[in-house]
A protein has these predicted regions:
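Conserved donor-nucleotide/metal-binding helix-loop-beta segment in metal-dependent transferases, i.e.
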Residues: 19-41, 224
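Short amphipathic alpha-helical coupling elements at transmembrane boundaries
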Residues: 137-145, 191, 195, 205, ...
Length: 351
């Protein structure tokens, strides 16, 4: 601090895990700020301080003590969370800033689980939010320890994605659907692994999201070809052509909505978040189709999936018309969670 010669300094403890957004927030403040977290042995703090001796208590044994001293002397203010921009567009959710002290292995494991849970998207499908997390967690933890790069997981997922298509077309449903579910789970694993290990890359994002956009209609064509026995004039294959058009139209609507509001159509309002749980997307359609195949209703399920895609696109069309030219800040209010805190609180007991 003394070497800073009056320049601002952000003080961190080596035994803490800090939210990168909090560091950026502190760096943009103009005065001394402190941020506290935890209780008892896990109480910790980070301090944004000017590099001058009058504001620095050299007798402080740790940053929490220093922060307390600065507050008592009026030399700093606590971080005002109303000024903190907690919305994460990529995750479609609000996360409060976090700061944790790693006191032992138990605390480390709790923090790791918190980071895992807080990296789930706020608006996503039922399978991703309720079915896959236990399996994804059991995969992400050892992969992180083994330092497996998330791009490796992404590439394995891509191989599974397109290897499933000829199996679908041949009516080899068991191996095809096995590969499909492997890809579906790995699609959650690579993103969580990248964010937890801070190894996200533009190339990985491109491969991951590019595959997500391209492969669903290819799968649907494969399903229809397998159901029809290779008859391009069959009703089910003709329905797959309609599915392609509706799918592309729906994706265009999602992009238009983001252009006109600055937000994802999937989390603009609470109703959008709820509907995203069951709207027509790959994971939901995959689960429905597999169950239908098991009871001999593959054709009926496929027609239902096409109809559900059409209803999803219609709802998105209504939302685009409804909010076209609207205020980009509209709908940004923080959603309250049951305990009265802001969604994404860093209280570990919530996870």
């Amino acid at each position: 601090v003394e070497d800073a010669k009056g320049d601002p300094v952000i003080c961190l403890s080596a035994d803490t895990e800090i939210d990168g957004r909090l560091v950026i927030h502190l760096a943009t403040r103009q005065d001394n700020r402190v941020f506290f977290s935890g209780e008892g042995d896990e109480r910790c703090a980070t301090v944004r301080i000017r590099g001058d001796v009058p504001d620095f208590d050299e007798s402080a044994g740790d940053l929490a003590t220093l922060a307390d001293s600065m507050l008592r002397r009026g030399a700093a203010q606590e971080v005002d969370l109303t000024e903190f921009k907690g919305y994460i567009a990529k995750l479609r959710r609000y996360n409060a800033p976090y700061l944790f002290k790693l006191t032992n292995e138990e605390a480390r494991d709790r923090i790791a689980r918190f980071l895992f849970d807080s990296n789930y998207k706020g608006a996503t499908d039922f399978m991703t939010s309720h079915v896959y997390p236990p399996l994804v967690w059991r995969m992400v933890k050892p992969l992180a320890q083994w330092r497996v790069h998330p791009n490796v997981v992404t590439i394995i997922g891509i191989i599974a994605t397109f290897s499933a298509v000829p199996l679908f077309a041949a009516g080899a449903w068991i191996p095809g659907m096995t590969l499909a579910f492997i890809m579906s789970v790995l699609d959650s694993v690579d993103g969580k692994l990248a964010r937890l290990t801070y190894t996200s890359t533009p190339q990985g994002d491109f491969l991951d999201h590019g595959t997500d956009y391209i492969h669903p209609p290819i799968w649907y064509f494969g399903w229809a070809w397998g159901l029809s026995g290779g008859d391009p004039y069959s009703g089910v294959f003709q329905a797959s052509i309609w599915m392609m058009g509706i799918y592309v139209f729906d994706r265009i609507l999602e992009r238009l909505f983001k252009i006109c509001t600055g937000r994802s159509i999937q989390d603009f309002r609470p109703i959008d978040v709820k509907l995203r749980t069951f709207t027509s997307r790959r994971n939901i359609n995959l689960a429905v189709f597999v169950v239908a195949l098991m009871v001999g209703l593959g054709h009926e399920a496929f027609y239902a999936i096409v109809g559900w895609q059409a209803l999803t696109a219609f709802y998105h069309f209504v939302r685009v018309v409804q909010f076209w030219g609207g205020d980009p800040e509209e709908g940004l209010e923080k959603r309250q969670v049951p305990d009265g805190g802001i969604e994404g609180s860093n209280n570990l007991s919530n996870f």
